[in-house]
Amino acid sequence: MGDWSFLGNILEEVNEHSTVIGRVWLTVLFIFRILILGTAAEFVWGDEQSDFVCNTQQPGCENVCYDEAFPISHIRLWVLQIIFVSTPSLMYVGHAVHHVRMEEKRKDREAEELCQQSRSNGGERVPIAPDQASIRKSSSSSKGTKKFRLEGTLLRTYVCHIIFKTLFEVGFIVGHYFLYGFRILPLYRCSRWPCPNVVDCFVSRPTEKTIFILFMLSVAFVSLFLNIMEMSHLGMKGIRSAFKRPVEQPLGEIAEKSLHSIAVSSIQKAKGYQLLEEEKIVSHYFPLTEVGMVETSPLSAKPFSQFEEKIGTGPLADMSRSYQETLPSYAQVGVQEVEREEPPIEEAVEPEVGEKKQEAEKVAPEGQETVAVPDRERVETPGVGKEDEKEELQAEKVTKQGLSAEKAPSLCPELTTDDNRPLSRLSKASSRARSDDLTI
């Protein structure tokens, strides 16, 4: 009996990870197979070969006839049957133990994560989810009341081990029938070589051995029936769960849709006040009035200001001229207003001055532009009488003719950009202003 202790300790683990029918099968295996085989069967088949007697004196004939009658001992055949039938259960136990260890590791990781979350929250107690509470309760329960659920790969392994047990049971029953039949006769006739003729051999305890054979075969049929019942039980359970799933899924979908609609309605309320940072992450739709109130960044004005400063540079002088011919700048409008207040000057003199200014601009280099003689100086001279004005104008004309050829190239480029305009229009504007003064 001590030889079966190792197998018995392993099969006890199967009891914790099996269904009710599986536990009944293990009970049948332990009590009606291992226990009886270890106690009574060995004594019944102990004198098997010594009590096998044949009516011949031919050497070797008795041994040959025994080998033909019993190719393998019944006890050894039943031992092999128990080992082969228990092997799928051992494989399942190995997978179940691995699964249990993985679950324990996962629970330990969840416990560590909960501890870290509680520490990060400043020692506040984190609410325990129902799943985590069930995990703690199941871990705190005793080993005897421990429940084990068959799901996923573990369920597949369990079904496979039942199938293999059934196949081994059927195989050994069929093999037993072809080897011995279902009973042992007291007389066995042998005609195998080296026997000279047909030899009669007699078997000891044939009735007792027949009873043991029938008992062991009945136990094999019971275990086979339990395997079939367990397969049908798991099949019915799977069918029931398959019928329950379509009813449960639409209910879950309806609950999710109702929660989604509630969340949308709460977002629509937040139209008249500024949302918090947490609510801005959830809300995705904003009114059109709020979109237009977005403040522009101060950086947007910088590139345009830099671009406006670069327009007045030397390489873009030609472009500035074309724009100044079409539209007057602020500087030109201010000069025109000042020229209206100037005293009248003869129109014939102004074109000559304009021609000289254009010649001075052509002589100037590309990076610098010449400027016409500022007309603001004319405004500063107060007009007292017409005669005094004429004398002053003639003196200014003489000075302009001398300075236009000498000082035009040395003028600063900043003034050229402001006063670079066609003189023909200035002369017309000045002549109109002077004519208005004369009429008054």
From Swiss-Prot:
Q: Which cysteines are joined by disulfide bonds?
A: 54-201, 61-195, 65-190
Tell me how this protein sits in the membrane: Multi-pass membrane protein
Q: Which residues lie on this side of the membrane: Extracellular?
A: 43-71, 183-210
One Gene Ontology cellular component: plasma membrane
Q: What is its main location?
A: membrane
Q: From start to end residue, where is composition biased (Low complexity)? A: 423-432
Q: Where in the cell is it found?
A: Cell membrane; Cell junction, Gap junction
In its UniProt record, a GO molecular function of this protein is: gap junction channel activity
For this protein, the record's InterPro entries field holds:
Connexin, Connexin50, Connexin_CCC, Connexin_CS, Connexin_N, Connexin_N_sf
What residue intervals traverse the membrane? 22-42, 72-92, 162-182, 211-231
Known tissue expression:
Detected in eye lens (at protein level). Eye lens.
Q: Spell out the coiled coil positions from the record.
A: none
What Pfam families does the database record attribute to this sequence?
Answer: Connexin, Connexin50
According to its UniProt entry, one GO biological process term is:
gap junction-mediated intercellular transport
List all Basic and acidic residues biased stretches: 353-364, 374-399
Q: Which UniProt keywords apply?
A: Cell junction, Cell membrane, Disulfide bond, Gap junction, Membrane, Transmembrane, Transmembrane helix
* Region listing for Disordered, in residue ranges: 111-143, 338-440
Which regions face the Cytoplasmic side of the membrane? 13-21, 93-161, 232-440
Q: Which residues lie within the membrane without crossing it?
A: 2-12
Function recorded in the entry: Structural component of eye lens gap junctions. Gap junctions are dodecameric channels that connect the cytoplasm of adjoining cells. They are formed by the docking of two hexameric hemichannels, one from each cell membrane. Small molecules and ions diffuse from one cell to a neighboring cell via the central pore.
Q: Which family does it belong to?
A: Belongs to the connexin family. Alpha-type (group II) subfamily.
Q: What is this protein called?
A: Gap junction alpha-8 protein
* Classification lineage: Eukaryota, Metazoa, Chordata, Craniata, Vertebrata
